[in-house]
Amino acid sequence: MRSTLCWITLGLWIVTIVVAGWLFVQGWTTQGTDRRMQIVLAPAERDLILGEMRMLLKAVHGVVTGLAGQNQDANRTQMEQAARSAGMDMAADVNPMLMAKLPLPFKQMGLSIHAEMDALADAIVQNETPQQILQRLSNMTVRCTTCHDLYRFSTEH
């Protein structure tokens, strides 16, 4: 009897781990009508993610605006602050339940963008050339467009 209970417990534990692992990788997704993967979120979660994307875009705009300015030395502080505002600190407080709903490739792309924003801020402080900074931005924004090509958000009904 005791052996059977142990096997049942072990089986349930394994099933739980497999399901949790599958959800961690897949997230809460369905196939969209436009061939993109739909990430299913609550309306407030969707608004939070879209707001974060807008903040990332504003950070890119802040860096590009600084590069376009005449006074590069004065603009470096503005550029560094813009990039740093979208770094890993921005992603630190995301609700773990929300993160669980996101598919693994989406999480990887998003976190890599935040990490590279911090690296961009460091590069600005270290006086990388405008060309080097633009190359970094280009490497980041290609992931943004890839993500938008692959995913879309829908809300729970």
Predicted features and spans:
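N-terminal export/targeting leaders of redox proteins
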Residues: 1-114, 155-157
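The canonical Cys-X-X-Cys-His
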Residues: 140-152
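Solvent-exposed, charged/polar functional surfaces in cytosolic regulatory/catalytic domains
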Residues: 62, 119, 143-146
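A broadly tuned, weak detector of single residues within folded domains
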Residues: 49, 137-140
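Helix-capping and short linker residues that terminate individual alpha-solenoid repeat units
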Residues: 87-88, 125, 144
